[in-house]
Amino acid sequence: MEFDTIAAISTALGEGAIAIVRVSGDDAVEKVNRIFKGKDLTEVPSHTIHYGHIVDLDTNQVIEEVMVSIMRAPRTFTRENIVEINCHGGLVSVNKVLQLILAQGVRLAEPGEFTKRAFLNGRIDLSQAEAVMDLIRAKTDRAMNVAINQMEGRLSKLIGRLRQDILETLAHVEVNIDYPEYDDVEEMTHNILIEKATHVRAEIAKILETSKQGKILREGIATAIIGRPNVGKSSLLNSLVQEKKAIVTDIAGTTRDVIEEYVNVRGVPLKLIDTAGIRETEDVVERIGVERSKEMMSQADLVLVVVNYSEALTNEDEELFRAVQGKDFIVIVNKTDLPQAIDMERVIELAAGNRVITTSLIEEQGIDELEKAIADLFFEGTIDSADVTYVSNARHIGLLTQAGKTIGDAIEAIENGVPIDMVQIDLTRTWEILGEITGDTVHESLIDQLFSQFCLGK
């Protein structure tokens, strides 16, 4: 496949030691060589780095001191010639280098276009391409490992094997229908077809079993910290984040807005939401914060309910317990360094079988137990991202669910005695749906939409 030559800044914009401008295309080396003062880049071997300067051809002025990496097709990310220019970080210098490259007839790359070319040129499939963005956005080591496994093709291989099984079954059916006189080909009976289709459905279900945990590792657990004012919600957030992100004071109602922070809890990414203290209030600003807190609580995957060990339960406390019924929640009884005034038996009763953990955040007690409880709740205490192929992408989960239903329709049709040639339709559709995961049967408009979500220069 032939494309024009593209370029973009591949590092984050801002001040830094190094910035990288990436160029990809058949004539990438020749275009960069025009503005490079140093070795003739068209003569150097592939996968080598060269020192020199970028020069403005109009003024013959040296613009930047650079190191240039030359990587020749097909052993590159895009399977095209790639040049990467390492220059000093900073908005002015790196943008000037980019502008000089574009002046040589190179086009500014669209978001995700380098990865899109890697896909279109057969370097990676669509699920591997999507994993590139997952790797960039990974919040924990576990999430990073899941993305790397997908980039290396672990999910692709599973899907490929399923599609091959279906294809072989379809071919067998075709031979039976078109060439019934062939005695050396086993007859595809309803029983054999049910066995093969059931195997495919079971494998799809097995992959989908990892989807809840996979989605958590990819997107995090939306976790709302709720409680009356001054029970220690912001202190809990700070203890988990291990930095002073929220303002902590002894004045009730200090947190008037919703504070969000990602935190790594034993490999699980938590999107922590510290909410304004929920209570009746006449303060307009505080009341807005309270309403937003209630909204965030309803959207959360996990709720941490904080109550005060040194105070008796109030009607507001009990109302919070009623509000979280039906959700995953953990109760934190904070301030155990103070004299007890709370009725712990009542707390356990209101928790309705959910974990109750006592803490003294000021003395840094109870956080380890809380982190373990969170990991136990969602992963039964273990996360084996190295050996398990997690499916974490919502698009993949949707397609696998759809494929499972379609193959289920095929099994039902076979059991009801529908002619085998009619069952082919559902089998073929299942094969096509699974192909959408890897990009083998996907529409071009979807490809464009997926890659438009990537960052520029990737």
From Swiss-Prot:
K(+) binds at residues 230, 249, 251, 254. One of its GO terms (biological process) is tRNA wobble uridine modification. Its cofactor is K(+). Keywords: Cytoplasm, GTP-binding, Hydrolase, Magnesium, Metal-binding, Nucleotide-binding, Potassium, tRNA processing. Exhibits a very high intrinsic GTPase hydrolysis rate. Involved in the addition of a carboxymethylaminomethyl (cmnm) group at the wobble position (U34) of certain tRNAs, forming tRNA-cmnm(5)s(2)U34. NCBIfam families: mnmE_trmE_thdF, PRK05291.1-3, small_GTP. InterPro entries: G_TrmE, GTP-bd, GTP-bd_TrmE_N, GTPase_MnmE, MnmE_dom2, MnmE_helical, P-loop_NTPase, Small_GTP-bd. GTP binds at residues 230-235, 249-255, 274-277. It comes from Bacillus cereus (strain ZK / E33L). Its EC number is 3.6.-.-. This is tRNA modification GTPase MnmE. Belongs to the TRAFAC class TrmE-Era-EngA-EngB-Septin-like GTPase superfamily. TrmE GTPase family. One of its GO terms (molecular function) is GTPase activity. Its main location: cytoplasm. Binds 1 potassium ion per subunit. Mg(2+) binds at residues 234, 255. Homodimer. Heterotetramer of two MnmE and two MnmG subunits. GO terms for cellular component: cytosol. It is found in: Cytoplasm. Residues 220-379 form the TrmE-type G domain. (6S)-5-formyl-5,6,7,8-tetrahydrofolate binds at residues 22, 84, 123, 458.
